[in-house]
Amino acid sequence: MPNALKLIERRIIKPRLRRLKRWRYVTYGHIHVHYKDHLDGGGRTSGLNYLPFLRDLNLPRQQRVFEWCAGPGFIGFALLGHGFCDTLCVADINPEAIAACRRTVANNGLANKVAIYHSDNLDSIAPSEQWDLVVGNPPHFADSAPGELRFHDEDWNLHRRFFKTVARFLKPGGIIVLLENNCGSTAETFRGMIDEAGLSIIFVRGCEGRRTPYTRIYYIGIMRKGETPPAWIHLGNRGGAVL
């Protein structure tokens, strides 16, 4: 009975209560990004470390950026609002997160710059999508927070499926830069599945060689096997990026 009550609470009561919560917004550049607190999986805090990280890599302005596991799109809209890209694509499986993204697009007049997909991983992405840069703050744990979309990736299946399908959406020379958490993984956690998908790790920044007992954000840079890393990666390395 206790388990049944918990299931009712999680599937019925909490979703109804969440709909009553008020909308908030945070501003990145000229863009007001709308969200509710329960939709934030860290994009509004640690996710914004992408901005100085990519700036330190000397990233040139990108034509099109995709944010995987976007939630309300904090990272993607921040990159767009601060001039890191011309256009943006976001996707998430959570309909509430998609509603937040649509609210942001409508209220900021971004319909001609932003594409939004309600998608289980990349399953519902239009085949015509082509991205220069992919970013994402996906669930960071395979062994904790089961049932919590923002944090749990059972047996790393979400990551594995992503790596298997993302290459078709990358432009030639396109790059993936994922934000991960050393408390839940290391770069080696993903190396095998990245390799099996025909991709290659081109840099790792900020990762210890073991899982840590505390939160430690790190980044993995990934490309198709055989492709030459862009010049800005090498320029950024002289500024301190760790390969």
PLM region descriptions:
Residues 135-161:
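Mobile active-site "lid"/loop adjacent to the S-adenosyl-L-methionine
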